[in-house]
Amino acid sequence: MKRLRLAFADSPRGPWRDVSEPFTGDWVEGPSVARIGPEWLIYFDHYTQPQHYGAVRTTDWRTFEDITAQLSFPADHRHGTVVKISEELARRLQARRPAPTSR
């Protein structure tokens, strides 16, 4: 089972300490982290049935709240990341977005 855990170190190379218990369900991978105000959001791919993109949030890196139900992602979204852009660029990108197609 793949689950996300957290560990601490003074160097990116370790040594590691304070390894957490898993803070996601089973069978997740591809995490991406974004800071939004005082909160940190960790997005991940849940790749067994039902497949979906999930997320948890934390402010202290010790406790995590599952916020998957509060978010929406495009169908079949996998292994993404978050990039900060200006509101102007967001408007321009949305204006150029193609119409959805059915499968």
Can you name each region flagged by the protein language model?
Residues 1-103:
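Carbohydrate-active catalytic/glycan-binding domains of CAZyme proteins
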